[in-house]
Amino acid sequence: LLILHILFINDKNHLIFLHRMKLIADSGSTKTVWFLIDNNGNLLQKISTDGLNPFYQTEEQVADVIKNQLKPQLSINSIDYIYFYGAGCAFPEKNAIIQSGILMVLQVAGIEINSDLLGAARGICGKEAGIACILGTGSNSCFYQNGLIYKNVPPLGFILGDEGSGAALGKKLIGDYLKKQLPQDVQNSFAQKYKISTAEILDRTYKQAFPN
Protein backbone atom coordinates (compact mmCIF):
# COMPACT_ATOMS: atom_id res chain seq x y z
CA LEU A 1 0.00 0.00 0.00
CA LEU A 2 2.86 2.37 0.82
CA ILE A 3 4.39 1.63 -2.58
CA LEU A 4 1.18 2.57 -4.36
CA HIS A 5 0.89 5.65 -2.18
CA ILE A 6 4.39 6.80 -3.15
CA LEU A 7 3.76 6.11 -6.83
CA PHE A 8 0.51 7.98 -7.16
CA ILE A 9 1.37 10.87 -4.86
CA ASN A 10 4.85 11.64 -6.17
CA ASP A 11 4.78 10.75 -9.88
CA LYS A 12 3.19 13.95 -11.19
CA ASN A 13 3.79 12.88 -14.80
CA HIS A 14 1.72 9.71 -14.47
CA LEU A 15 -1.41 9.47 -16.59
CA ILE A 16 -3.77 9.64 -13.62
CA PHE A 17 -2.90 13.26 -12.98
CA LEU A 18 -4.62 14.25 -16.20
CA HIS A 19 -7.88 13.73 -14.33
CA ARG A 20 -9.31 15.99 -11.63
CA MET A 21 -10.37 13.58 -8.88
CA LYS A 22 -9.03 10.03 -8.77
CA LEU A 23 -9.93 6.98 -6.76
CA ILE A 24 -7.15 4.39 -6.68
CA ALA A 25 -7.78 0.91 -5.31
CA ASP A 26 -5.28 -1.68 -4.13
CA SER A 27 -7.29 -4.86 -3.67
CA GLY A 28 -6.45 -8.32 -2.44
CA SER A 29 -8.79 -11.17 -1.67
CA THR A 30 -8.96 -10.08 1.96
CA LYS A 31 -9.04 -6.28 1.90
CA THR A 32 -9.30 -3.36 -0.52
CA VAL A 33 -7.73 0.01 0.27
CA TRP A 34 -9.04 3.02 -1.66
CA PHE A 35 -7.05 6.25 -2.05
CA LEU A 36 -8.92 9.44 -2.98
CA ILE A 37 -6.47 11.83 -4.66
CA ASP A 38 -6.92 15.32 -6.11
CA ASN A 39 -5.33 16.80 -9.23
CA ASN A 40 -2.31 18.03 -7.27
CA GLY A 41 -1.51 14.58 -5.97
CA ASN A 42 -2.79 15.25 -2.48
CA LEU A 43 -4.19 12.29 -0.57
CA LEU A 44 -7.65 13.36 0.56
CA GLN A 45 -8.94 10.13 2.01
CA LYS A 46 -8.02 6.50 2.63
CA ILE A 47 -10.81 3.94 2.93
CA SER A 48 -10.75 0.21 3.65
CA THR A 49 -13.40 -2.26 2.48
CA ASP A 50 -13.68 -6.00 2.01
CA GLY A 51 -11.46 -7.54 -0.65
CA LEU A 52 -12.74 -7.81 -4.22
CA ASN A 53 -11.68 -10.76 -6.34
CA PRO A 54 -13.57 -11.59 -9.57
CA PHE A 55 -12.78 -15.28 -9.16
CA TYR A 56 -14.86 -15.40 -5.99
CA GLN A 57 -17.46 -12.64 -6.44
CA THR A 58 -20.16 -11.72 -8.93
CA GLU A 59 -20.90 -8.25 -10.30
CA GLU A 60 -23.73 -7.95 -7.80
CA GLN A 61 -21.48 -8.84 -4.87
CA VAL A 62 -18.89 -6.29 -6.01
CA ALA A 63 -21.63 -3.67 -6.29
CA ASP A 64 -22.81 -4.54 -2.78
CA VAL A 65 -19.36 -3.81 -1.31
CA ILE A 66 -19.13 -0.52 -3.23
CA LYS A 67 -22.63 0.55 -2.21
CA ASN A 68 -22.54 -0.44 1.45
CA GLN A 69 -18.87 -0.07 2.39
CA LEU A 70 -17.14 2.38 0.03
CA LYS A 71 -19.75 4.94 -1.02
CA PRO A 72 -20.97 5.82 2.51
CA GLN A 73 -17.38 6.68 3.49
CA LEU A 74 -16.52 8.83 0.47
CA SER A 75 -16.18 12.49 1.39
CA ILE A 76 -17.16 13.69 -2.11
CA ASN A 77 -19.91 12.74 -4.54
CA SER A 78 -18.04 13.16 -7.83
CA ILE A 79 -15.18 10.89 -8.95
CA ASP A 80 -13.60 11.49 -12.36
CA TYR A 81 -11.52 8.37 -12.75
CA ILE A 82 -10.99 5.06 -10.98
CA TYR A 83 -7.79 3.00 -11.14
CA PHE A 84 -8.38 -0.46 -9.69
CA TYR A 85 -5.45 -2.82 -9.11
CA GLY A 86 -6.67 -6.15 -7.83
CA ALA A 87 -6.02 -9.82 -7.20
CA GLY A 88 -7.51 -11.96 -9.96
CA CYS A 89 -7.63 -9.01 -12.37
CA ALA A 90 -5.32 -10.39 -15.05
CA PHE A 91 -7.98 -11.47 -17.55
CA PRO A 92 -10.38 -9.22 -19.51
CA GLU A 93 -13.44 -11.30 -18.68
CA LYS A 94 -12.62 -11.14 -14.96
CA ASN A 95 -11.80 -7.44 -15.08
CA ALA A 96 -15.25 -6.87 -16.57
CA ILE A 97 -16.84 -8.28 -13.40
CA ILE A 98 -15.09 -5.71 -11.21
CA GLN A 99 -15.76 -2.89 -13.66
CA SER A 100 -19.44 -3.67 -14.03
CA GLY A 101 -19.90 -4.00 -10.28
CA ILE A 102 -18.28 -0.64 -9.61
CA LEU A 103 -20.23 1.13 -12.35
CA MET A 104 -23.50 -0.17 -10.95
CA VAL A 105 -22.93 2.22 -8.05
CA LEU A 106 -20.44 4.93 -9.04
CA GLN A 107 -20.74 7.15 -12.11
CA VAL A 108 -17.28 8.07 -13.41
CA ALA A 109 -15.72 9.44 -16.60
CA GLY A 110 -13.38 6.48 -16.89
CA ILE A 111 -12.20 3.35 -15.15
CA GLU A 112 -9.20 1.05 -15.55
CA ILE A 113 -8.92 -2.43 -14.07
CA ASN A 114 -5.47 -4.00 -13.80
CA SER A 115 -3.74 -6.67 -11.74
CA ASP A 116 -2.41 -6.00 -8.27
CA LEU A 117 0.98 -7.07 -9.58
CA LEU A 118 1.01 -4.28 -12.17
CA GLY A 119 0.13 -1.77 -9.46
CA ALA A 120 3.00 -3.00 -7.31
CA ALA A 121 5.41 -2.97 -10.27
CA ARG A 122 4.49 0.60 -11.19
CA GLY A 123 4.91 1.64 -7.58
CA ILE A 124 8.30 -0.04 -7.16
CA CYS A 125 9.84 0.58 -10.56
CA GLY A 126 8.09 3.68 -11.86
CA LYS A 127 9.45 4.25 -15.37
CA GLU A 128 12.45 1.96 -14.88
CA ALA A 129 12.70 -1.75 -15.69
CA GLY A 130 12.85 -4.13 -12.76
CA ILE A 131 11.53 -7.15 -10.88
CA ALA A 132 8.48 -6.72 -8.66
CA CYS A 133 7.02 -9.18 -6.16
CA ILE A 134 3.91 -9.22 -4.01
CA LEU A 135 3.26 -11.38 -0.97
CA GLY A 136 -0.04 -11.41 0.90
CA THR A 137 -2.98 -13.78 0.82
CA GLY A 138 -1.49 -14.81 -2.54
CA SER A 139 1.96 -14.40 -4.09
CA ASN A 140 3.20 -13.27 -7.49
CA SER A 141 6.23 -11.80 -9.27
CA CYS A 142 7.16 -10.33 -12.64
CA PHE A 143 9.72 -8.58 -14.79
CA TYR A 144 8.41 -5.08 -15.52
CA GLN A 145 9.42 -2.85 -18.43
CA ASN A 146 8.01 0.21 -20.22
CA GLY A 147 5.06 0.47 -17.86
CA LEU A 148 3.88 -3.10 -18.41
CA ILE A 149 4.46 -6.62 -17.12
CA TYR A 150 6.89 -8.16 -19.59
CA LYS A 151 7.39 -11.64 -18.09
CA ASN A 152 5.42 -13.47 -15.42
CA VAL A 153 4.99 -17.00 -14.11
CA PRO A 154 1.24 -17.45 -13.45
CA PRO A 155 0.58 -17.65 -9.67
CA LEU A 156 -2.33 -20.12 -10.24
CA GLY A 157 -4.14 -19.31 -7.00
CA PHE A 158 -4.09 -20.90 -3.57
CA ILE A 159 -4.84 -24.45 -4.73
CA LEU A 160 -2.29 -24.81 -7.55
CA GLY A 161 0.23 -22.13 -6.63
CA ASP A 162 0.70 -18.99 -4.50
CA GLU A 163 3.78 -20.54 -2.91
CA GLY A 164 4.93 -18.78 0.25
CA SER A 165 1.71 -16.78 0.57
CA GLY A 166 -0.53 -16.39 3.59
CA ALA A 167 -2.95 -18.86 2.03
CA ALA A 168 -0.20 -21.44 1.51
CA LEU A 169 1.14 -21.06 5.04
CA GLY A 170 -2.38 -21.11 6.46
CA LYS A 171 -3.22 -24.26 4.54
CA LYS A 172 -0.13 -25.96 5.95
CA LEU A 173 -0.94 -24.82 9.48
CA ILE A 174 -4.57 -25.95 9.35
CA GLY A 175 -3.60 -29.30 7.83
CA ASP A 176 -1.04 -29.98 10.55
CA TYR A 177 -3.54 -28.90 13.22
CA LEU A 178 -6.25 -31.24 11.98
CA LYS A 179 -3.74 -34.10 11.73
CA LYS A 180 -2.44 -33.27 15.23
CA GLN A 181 1.08 -32.85 13.89
CA LEU A 182 1.77 -29.47 15.52
CA PRO A 183 3.91 -29.21 18.67
CA GLN A 184 1.58 -29.89 21.59
CA ASP A 185 1.75 -26.36 23.02
CA VAL A 186 0.93 -24.86 19.60
CA GLN A 187 -1.86 -27.41 19.11
CA ASN A 188 -3.38 -26.48 22.47
CA SER A 189 -3.02 -22.72 21.92
CA PHE A 190 -4.68 -22.92 18.51
CA ALA A 191 -7.57 -24.99 19.84
CA GLN A 192 -8.10 -22.65 22.79
CA LYS A 193 -7.97 -19.48 20.70
CA TYR A 194 -10.16 -20.48 17.75
CA LYS A 195 -12.44 -23.14 19.25
CA ILE A 196 -13.34 -24.50 15.81
CA SER A 197 -14.20 -28.08 14.95
CA THR A 198 -12.92 -30.21 12.09
CA ALA A 199 -16.41 -30.15 10.55
CA GLU A 200 -16.49 -26.33 10.62
CA ILE A 201 -13.06 -26.08 9.02
CA LEU A 202 -14.00 -28.48 6.22
CA ASP A 203 -17.28 -26.66 5.65
CA ARG A 204 -15.54 -23.28 5.37
CA THR A 205 -12.89 -24.75 3.10
CA TYR A 206 -15.04 -26.69 0.66
CA LYS A 207 -18.49 -25.10 0.79
CA GLN A 208 -18.29 -21.45 1.82
CA ALA A 209 -17.01 -18.43 -0.09
CA PHE A 210 -13.39 -17.24 0.24
CA PRO A 211 -11.80 -20.49 1.43
CA ASN A 212 -8.38 -18.85 1.14
Describe the predicted segments one by one.
Residues 22-26, 81-83, 130-134:
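Short glycine-aspartate micro-motif
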Residues 45-78, 89-97:
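N-terminal phosphate-binding loop and adjacent alpha-helix
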Residues 109-133:
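Conserved phosphate-binding catalytic cores of ATP/NTP-utilizing and phosphoryl-transfer enzymes
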Residues 191-212:
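An accessory alpha-helical subdomain
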